[in-house]
Structures are given as C-alpha cells and as structure tokens.
Amino acid sequence: MYKLKALNFLKKQLTRLKVVDMEASCLYIYKWSRMIRKIESDDNPKASAGSTSAKGVYQFTDASVQTAKNRMHNMGFFKEDIREISSNPHNWTNEQADCMFLANMFAQKGSDKLLGKIAYGDLDAMKEAYYKFHHTNPDKATIKRVDKLMVI
C-alpha cells in the first residue's frame, strides 16, 4: 500500500468523491497504479524510454515533471515536500513517484468520474483513464501491453 503522504492524499480525494468503502477503494487505486508502473517501466525507477525524455517508474517526461509538481501544489501538498522532489524521475523515492502520479491524475479536468469508477474496480475506467490522462498517444505495442498487464 502507499506510504503516508500518498495514502493521506488519496484518502482526501476519495472522501471528496464520496466513496463508500475507503479501504477497498484505496486498494483498487493502488493496484491500478502498480499496473501502470509495470506497463510503463516494469516498475524500474531507472527505466528510460529512449525515444523520449520519459523516465522513472511512471515514465514522466522532462516537460511533465514541473506540471506534476504544480498540480501537487494545487492539490494541497506541502511546498517543502514538493521542493524535495528531484527534476529527474530516476531520483524519486517510491512515495515521491506515487504522490506525483496521484496528484497528476486527480488534478486533471474530467478525471473525477473515471477515478471514482476505478475506486470501485472498474477495469474499463482504469484503461480509459490511463489512455486519457497518462499515456495519451499509445502505439499498438503499448495497447497490447495494457491489455496483458491491466487486469483485475
């Protein structure tokens, strides 16, 4: 399960979304994020895309790091915690990576509806949110990998 900062953030968001079963909903979001880590990088913090600047477990690009930090700030994370996050995703702790991922997801316009469904284990919503808010231009190989690894 997520560590303290990521888990506290997630619980605040799920409370805002009025989920019924907090424990189960946290677990579904956690499992979904682990599937994304596996799809993106085989859960390797030192992974690099090669063809883009994407790196780390969630494959944040150089350009998306500052955007995610801004979203963390807008979503209520402490400035000190944000400041401690390197601009290089290879250097992130698991908790920093998870906080960046969660804030980046929950801050995006239109994400609440899909994240609310993910909190109840909706696999179609998991895939849709992944394609809409994280990997916005998947090739056939990525789609095949998602279909193989994103399972409940």
Predicted regions and their residues:
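Cell-wall polysaccharide-cleaving catalytic domain and substrate-binding groove, primarily
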Residues: 1-87, 99-113, 120-152
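Mid-length scaffold segments of soluble, non-membrane domains
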Residues: 92, 96-97
